Every structure is written in C-alpha cells, then in structure tokens.
C-alpha cells in the first residue's frame, strides 16, 4: 500500500491540447517556402518553430527564408551541440525569427510561450504530429499549429486524422491554391493506382473547395 499516493496525468499520444488552434493549408510542394514566408510576414509571427522531414531540407529552407528577409536557423543531426545551442538561444532571444528543426533534433526542446508551430512537411509517423504541435499552447497559453500540405501528403494527413479521431480544418489561401495538373511525386512506395487516379481525385476536390472553401489573404 502507498502511504501518500499521487495521481500523475500523462498526455496520451493521440490527443492534442484544446489551447492549440490547428489549420491545414493545401499548397503545391514547390510553393511551400513561398507560402511559409508569406504567412510569417503577413501574420507578423515573431517566433515560429518549423518542422521538416530531413536534415538537408531544414538547411535548404533556412536559405530560402533568408532570401525573403526572414532570419532563420536550423537544428539537425549534422549540427554540433554548440551550433544547436547557439541557434536555440538566438531563437529564444528573438535574434532568429524561425527555427527549422527535424523531429530528432527537436527532442527535449522547451520554449516558453511559443506562439506557432508549422509543419512544413507532414511527418511519416502520425504520433510525431502530436509531439510537434505539443510545443505550443502550453501552461494555459494559446498557440497555433499550421500544416502546409502538398497533394502527395494527403495520406499522411489521413493517418493523423485517424489517430486524433477528428477532421482537421483546411483552408485555401488566395493566390496559393494547389494546381490539379501539377506532377505528383510521392514520398511513399508506389502503389497500384496510377497518377491519373490521383489527379482525378484532386480535380474533384478542387470543385468541392471552390464551392465551400474559404479564400483569404
């Protein structure tokens, strides 16, 4: 028997905080960096944690953001511990506006009152989505979790929605609507159905969104 039992609550891997506002923006893959820069600038976000799938992708995104005048730094497995700590400190003190990270490198990150997390690329593991956005909306503060989804990532979104047992809201931003004729490049192994099937589905979704979706700047 326990003399002084205590109840410890652990957040399950299939739930997200109510304080986090989630949104998915469909966009062509090659326009993701452009949309990311637009969102950071137009929404005036001063502290944004951005997740990519690969180390190389995180470094390339830093270069793209700098071209748009947004100070950014990356933390990934190729960086030394000293370099990671410097990047994190610059992010916390406001010298760097966007911190680009991989899932592995971001483990253990603790940033108080982080205002926004962006999934530049959706994770292969749905549980990683929960871990990513769990870094905002802490201690009663509100936060935003934005996902930039290209057509070839729809299956990843479905996996996330299945895990969370909910549909995530989607919104098309005017000027960044996906092109239904864009070439499809999947990150997963090829399946039996062809690209024409995917394009037909995409065109059908375009018609649906045209009728009911919201277009905003």
Q: Could you describe each region identified by the protein language model?
A:
Residues 1-181:
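Conserved helicase RecA-like core
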Residues 93, 167-217:
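Basic Arg/Gly/Lys-rich low-complexity intrinsically disordered segments
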